[in-house]
From Swiss-Prot:
The active site is at residues 77, 152, 176. PROSITE patterns: AMIDASES. This is Glutamyl-tRNA(Gln) amidotransferase subunit A. The gene is gatA. The lineage of its organism: Bacteria, Bacillati, Bacillota, Bacilli, Lactobacillales. Its EC number is 6.3.5.7.
């Protein structure tokens, strides 16, 4: 029995009517995962016993008619702490780490009777754009197994796109939810910085990281954000926002909405076929009653350079805690304290992580701090001001999520600069702390294209409104890869 084609609302109806039990749904999800796992490699760990036991307890209590997420299984990126379930960040450094606490996002999900089904593969410590830097395996794109799934949340995206799970959580530091969502033809939201607690998220870039949901449809995405959003005393950067119902504007028309299309998002480095796809999407918004006008974000071209200084600097600080002393991997050949530190970090971290630690340490060093880290912070402010100017006159910004469709496995993983440039269109959103979503907008060369919608801070409801309006006029979200039972 496979239930992966049912929406969350449909599953809730089946659970309420007792046509299926939470345990049966969980078992069906585990079966869907196992049937596809050899082909795509989405998961690092399956929490089979724990998930089935939790489902039994939910069945015993009964499904809450007012809680659409009651009894729903979901997958979790492996840098989000789950008590009693391995949380490796896809690194040798944490290959055996089992947290003794849950991330706040997981606690919130458990409070709504959701079931963690397993932990998904990712780029090591979320550093990468293809899920190829994982210590454990390379995840494959759901549509074409010779292509990358994007990164760093590639496992979470592929798990949803291939029909293994209906929902998953990822994290987004420079595009790590939106880019894999685009590459796999699903919906991925990076909420406003501070909307979802970072407590229990293994830190990469603390001023940039944000947890967010993956889903098949816009409404399901908003339903999962409803669960995980909210302020948290355990996270000093958590925003004191009142949780709205993020589904409340879905279904409302967008007549009169003013949408901006930055010329920089369709310029150099963008595949001409993707440009054409996005211009068609813009026409669709106009048919729905919105106005779409060209604008400029002049400093966005510096986003990648700024990001790789700031994110790497923050990472070099955050990753100092992994030294072989308290938890995780420890080098066995070390004889002195210094050797424990040096050998553990040399052996425990992969090449990309070490590259970024060195880059960040250099940027923060006394002779270069002003020229690099301080200057990057100043340019970041200019990028933020560009967005503020546009949002003074417009409701939303649209553009491509990525400059190309999914690229081939083993094509860019030895070319760091080209890999970094794949985040050209997503990075500015993180630098400014804004919400951004990627939704399916068609296909180029048989591979999915993502349309990115960006709003001012705390405008997730508006983004979901526009995204759902676009989705309702297309069938891209209904088209599925062969592995999910589709024709493509």
């Amino acid at each position: 029995m496979s239930l992966n084609h049912k929406t969350i609302d449909e599953l809730h109806t089946l659970l309420l009517s007792k046509e299926i039990s939470a345990k049966e749904l969980t078992q069906a999800t585990l079966d869907d995962i196992k049937a596809r796992e050899d082909a795509v490699g989405s998961f690092i760990t399956l929490a089979e016993e724990k998930a089935l036991s939790q489902a039994e307890a939910i069945d015993a209590r009964g499904i809450d008619p007012n809680n659409v997420m009651s009894g729903i299984p979901f997958a979790v990126k492996d840098n989000i702490s789950t008590e009693g379930i391995l949380t490796t960040a896809a690194s040798k450094m944490l290959y055996n780490y089992e947290p003794i606490f849950n991330a706040t996002a997981i606690e919130k999900a458990y409070a709504k009777d959701m079931i963690v089904i397993g932990k998904t593969n990712m780029d090591e410590f979320a550093m990468g754009g293809s899920t190829e830097t994982s210590y454990f395996k390379k995840t494959k794109n759901a549509w074409d197994h010779s292509k990358v799934p994007g990164g760093s949340s590639g496992g979470s995206a592929t798990a949803v796109a291939s029909g293994q799970v209906r929902l998953s959580l990822g994290s987004d530091t420079g595009g790590s939810i939106r880019q894999p969502a685009a590459f796999n033809g699903i919906v991925g939201m990076k909420p406003t910085y501070g909307t979802v607690s970072r407590f229990g998220l293994i830190a990469f870039g603390s001023s940039l990281d944000q947890i967010g949901p993956f889903s098949q449809t816009v409404k399901e995405n908003a339903q999962l954000l409803n669960v995980i959003a909210g302020s948290d005393d355990k996270d000093s950067t958590s925003a004191p926002v009142q949780i709205a119902d993020y589904t409340s504007a879905i279904g409302k028309d967008i007549k009169g909405m003013k949408i901006a299309l930055p010329k920089e998002y369709l310029g150099e480095g963008i595949d001409p076929k993707i440009k054409e796809n996005i211009l068609e999407a813009a026409k669709q918004f106009e048919k729905l009653g919105a106005t779409v006008e060209e604008v400029s974000l002049p400093h966005s071209k510096y986003g990648v350079a700024v990001y790789y200084i700031i994110a790497s600097s923050e990472a070099s600080s955050n990753l100092q805690r992994f030294d072989g002393i308290r938890y995780g991997y420890r080098a066995q050949d070390a004889k002195t304290l210094e050797e424990i530190y040096v050998n553990t970090r040399s052996q425990g971290f992969g090449e990309e992580v070490k590259r970024r630690i060195m880059l960040g340490t250099f940027s923060l060093s006394s002779g270069y701090y002003d020229a690099y880290f301080k200057k990057a912070g100043q340019v970041r402010t200019l990028i933020i001001q560009d967005f503020e100017k546009v949002f003074a006159d417009y409701d939303l910004i649209i553009g491509p999520t990525a400059p190309t469709v999914a690229f081939g496995l083993d094509t860019l993983n030895h070319d760091p600069v080209s890999m970094y440039l794949a985040d050209l269109l997503t990075i500015p959103v993180n630098l400014a702390g804004l919400p951004g979503i990627s939704i399916p907008s068609g296909f180029v060369d048989g591979l999915p294209v993502g349309l990115q919608l960006i709003g001012p801070k705390y405008s997730e409801e508006r983004i979901y409104q526009a995204a759902a309006a676009f989705e309702a006029t297309t069938d891209y979200h209904k088209q599925q890869p062969v592995i999910f039972g589709g024709e493509k």
